[in-house]
Amino acid sequence: MRPWGRCGNPCAFAKFHAVPRSQSAGLLLYRRSPHGLEVFLVHPGGPFWAKKDLGAWSIPKGEIEPDEDPLAAAQREFEEETGFQISGEFRPLAPLKQKSGKTVYAWAVEGDCDPSGLKSNTVSLEWPPHSGRQQEFPEVDRAAWFPLDEAKRKILPGQVGFIEWLERATR
């Protein structure tokens, strides 16, 4: 299964095909625990997501800047949203199309970090709507490690395929 056509390389594929703004990149960080594999997910901040849990979490990800290497974008976004720098062997996953039409490129990487050290960047938005008042909210308000079965319930439905890939690849 080579989702990238003949090149077999997601970075080359994305560069060759001029990545539009409707694409983002992220990292699926995983670790091995005594209870099996766990994945690191983040919960979006802000008032819209405050009371949402199941189907609301995500891999740390964000938009790819013009002329930016997709893997570099994934690493940058991970650090911006969590405060953590991740290194290791980045394994490309097949891109997934979200309900919004956005395509998400992702890489799986084994590693570890402590969610209690989360340091997210912030976003400004008008809140309450039509109030004319801008407020700052963390882009990510929390992070956690989840066993794969629980992660599949927590993560946005359009990203479940990343966890399913990890299950198959690590059997």
Where are these predicted regions, by residue range?
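Aromatic (phenylalanine/tyrosine) cluster motif
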Residues: 13-16
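N-terminal strand-loop-strand
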Residues: 18-58, 107
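Short, charged/polar surface micro-motifs in flexible loops or helix N-caps
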Residues: 34-36, 46-49, 65-66, 100-101, ...
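The catalytic Nudix box helix
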Residues: 58-93, 147
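Active-site-adjacent beta-strand/loop module that shapes the phosphate/pyrophosphate-binding cleft
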Residues: 95-132, 144, 166
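Charged phosphate-binding loop/patch that engages nucleotide di/tri-phosphates or the phosphate backbone
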Residues: 148-171
